[in-house]
């Protein structure tokens, strides 16, 4: 696949829930989304930065969403759905996949900030279309399928002091 160069058009797509849960469960810390974006872009031409977030009705959410926008992310917000049996779900996988496929003709690289193996098939498709695919996540919670499917991987655990607050 293509190498990294400054003229590459890049989109950074962040699965905020996926990263948040690992940062909290393993490190009891939060993600530094400014550093995440800077590392994802890596000196290339940023086309889009999208953070996919879940609204869970906690008081600090709105300020978090606003902070993401101030950094430069477009935020896509989904409410938690409560089902008849009382279970709750909130998932952005399909939305992220649709955005990546829609943006792909206008990009050279897609950076997926997630460790979710559900995106491995997307990676294969994007690579087939000539788009470089990179992932950024905590390796200890990243699926092998995703690691095998991407052109490049940044392990946030290796530089936790940079990527965690």
Question: What is the meaning of each model-derived region?
Answer:
Residues 1-92, 132:
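Domain-level signal for Mg2+-assisted phosphodiester chemistry and nucleotide/NA-binding surfaces
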Residues 57-165:
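Nuclease catalytic cores that cleave nucleic-acid phosphodiester bonds
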């Amino acid at each position: 696949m293509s190498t990294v160069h400054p003229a590459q058009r890049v989109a950074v797509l962040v699965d905020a829930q996926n990263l948040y849960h690992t940062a909290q469960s393993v490190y009891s810390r939060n993600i530094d989304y400014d550093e995440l974006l800077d590392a994802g872009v890596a000196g290339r031409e940023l086309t889009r930065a999208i953070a996919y977030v879940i609204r869970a009705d906690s008081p600090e959410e709105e300020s978090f969403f606003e902070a993401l926008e101030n950094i430069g992310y477009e935020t896509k917000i989904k409410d938690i759905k409560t089902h008849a049996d009382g279970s709750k779900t909130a998932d952005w996988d399909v939305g992220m996949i649709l955005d990546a496929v829609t943006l792909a003709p206008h990009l050279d690289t897609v950076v997926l900030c997630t460790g979710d193996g559900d995106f491995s098939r997307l990676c294969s498709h994007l690579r087939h279309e000539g788009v470089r695919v990179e992932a950024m996540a905590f390796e200890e919670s990243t699926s092998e399928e995703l690691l095998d499917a991407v052109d490049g991987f940044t392990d946030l655990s290796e530089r936790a002091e940079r990527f965690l607050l």
